Amino acid sequence: MSTQPERAGLEASRLITVLANELKPVPPPQELRFGQSMTDHMLFASYDPVNGWSAPEIKPYGPFTLEPNSSCFQYGTSAFEGMKAYVGPDGEPRLFRPEMNIARFARSAARMSLPPFNPDELLKLIKALVAVEKRWIPAGKGYSLYIRPMIVAIGLLTSNTALLWVMCAPTGPYLKGGSQALSLLAMRDTVRAWPGGTGEYKVACNYGPTINPVQAALDKGYDQTLWLLGDKITEAGVMNVFIVLKRDDGGIDLITPPLDGTILPGVTRDSILALAAAHPARMTLPGLAPTTLLHPSERTMTMTELQAWLAEGRLLEMFSVGTAVVVQPIGNIGYDGKDIALPTFEGGRGPVGQALYERLTDIQDGRFEWEGWSVRCED
């Protein structure tokens, strides 16, 4: 009785590296636009149900061929990630909390019934790719190498045949206005996610349907959408949302919607909550006095509450967070045919948002050591 050979896992030890014969010029930082200048190389691997994962390759970036009837085209069976590499003070590349991104990528792939992979092995492969593309990482605050892992199904119905690749692009500030406060259009009749859906996963089917309402917001002069679920505030565009409130005891509440299945569990979101909880007992956030007590929490927040907090003078700041924007202030919300003006500040961010931004970017760049969040990519 014959036995089938064991399917191969995704293994960094099998990595094959084929470098490009000619390297492209790296654009100067001031010319960088998000996702427009791809680096010289990409990481690539394929999966089939008989052999498992192929030997991963780092090879020149370029197009490849897919069958027209691939499941990813017809049913949107794909998942992706977004993470960044930075130049540390020692000139070496480093990643920010990459294990969280890879774990989320694995969860998203599993939700789409895509083939499993070993997260630790994929992280080793991404480190190897970043080391190869080191020259593409721009230096300076607000600059980084954006890393996009992708996994797509290429079978018909079941997602048992797949391609996985990772591509990179140098990037500067995500928004043209830098830290300028965003103006959002609250969407009541169109929802991004719903209970029992896929809102907590980074899968393609969550993003395509948002393009039309985002364009509608842009056409009306707003920068992005504020997604609602009934009266509940959920996300801003593709970003998590925070509100800063004055407490009766003189402290400050920092609140964000809970992870109820409709909210993407953002790495930046988690980091903001952790840093706020550490101030001032374990470390002091730059620009905030040690006597300023922050009380971070996850709780439902509604447009009705937001307007009441404004009327009471309790709402101090509102900002969005994400891998691309880091911390972006929100200064206006279009809602029910009127604009709701939020507190704005010279320079963009309010004191709490700015303090969290400064500390977070210092950790990302390796200028401030915290909890092992900044991970070096060894050559």
Would you name each region that the model predicts?
Residues 1-129, 153-379:
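Helix-start/capping segments and mature chain N-termini
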Residues 129-132, 140:
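Internal, well-ordered alpha/beta segment that forms a basic, Gly-enriched binding/recognition surface
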Residues 137-152:
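Extended, Lys/Arg-enriched charged tracts that mediate electrostatic binding to polyanionic substrates
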